[in-house]
Regions:
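Non-catalytic signal-transmission and effector/linker regions of two-component phosphorelay proteins
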Residues: 1-11, 17, 24, 41-42, ...
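Charged docking surfaces used in two-component/phosphorelay signaling
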Residues: 21-29
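Acidic, metal-coordinating helix/loop segments flanking the phosphotransfer/catalytic sites
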Residues: 24, 36-55, 63, 95
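Conserved dinucleotide-binding and phosphotransfer motif residues
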Residues: 29-30, 78
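Two-component signal transduction core modules
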Residues: 56, 105-106
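Conserved phosphotransfer microenvironments
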Residues: 59-73
């Protein structure tokens, strides 16, 4: 996974190796740099060591331990202030009940185009919020 300073960095957190690799392949084909982790704990360690991330894209459920919601709560605010997009195959009604404020959601299964649209939307919202006077 190459890193280019001009390319936005998406951090993908997914316990399914195939899904994680496919997500990175899709994102890289659209011009993003992809970093990834197979667990919330691994993601937190990697983000702490190198916080250069433009969007966090994470599954919600992981076996044991912390969830994607926990990860969103830890990274969507200071010191990281990351835009977060969570994903799950669970019923949307359930997810809406547990989704933290300001965190976007993409229902599984999704197409590469839906993933790209969701990532760009999350990035655009964050830019608008960060613009003074807007």
């Amino acid at each position: 996974m190459s890193q280019n300073k001009d390319r936005p960095v998406v951090f993908v957190v997914e316990d399914g190796d195939g899904t994680r690799q496919l997500s990175c392949l899709v994102l890289e084909s659209y011009g993003f740099t992809c970093r990834s982790a197979g667990s919330v704990e691994e993601a937190l360690t990697l983000i702490e060591s190198d916080p250069r991330v433009d969007v966090l894209f994470s599954d919600i459920h992981f076996p044991g331990g912390l969830t994607g919601v926990d990860l969103a709560l830890k990274t969507a605010h200071a010191p990281y202030n990351l835009p977060v997009l969570l994903t799950s195959g669970l019923a949307v009604e359930y997810v809406e009940e547990i989704l933290p404020d300001g965190v976007a959601f993409l229902e599984k299964p999704y197409t590469p185009e839906q993933l790209l649209t969701a990532i760009r939307s999350v990035m655009a919202k964050r830019r608008v919020l960060a613009t003074p006077g807007v």
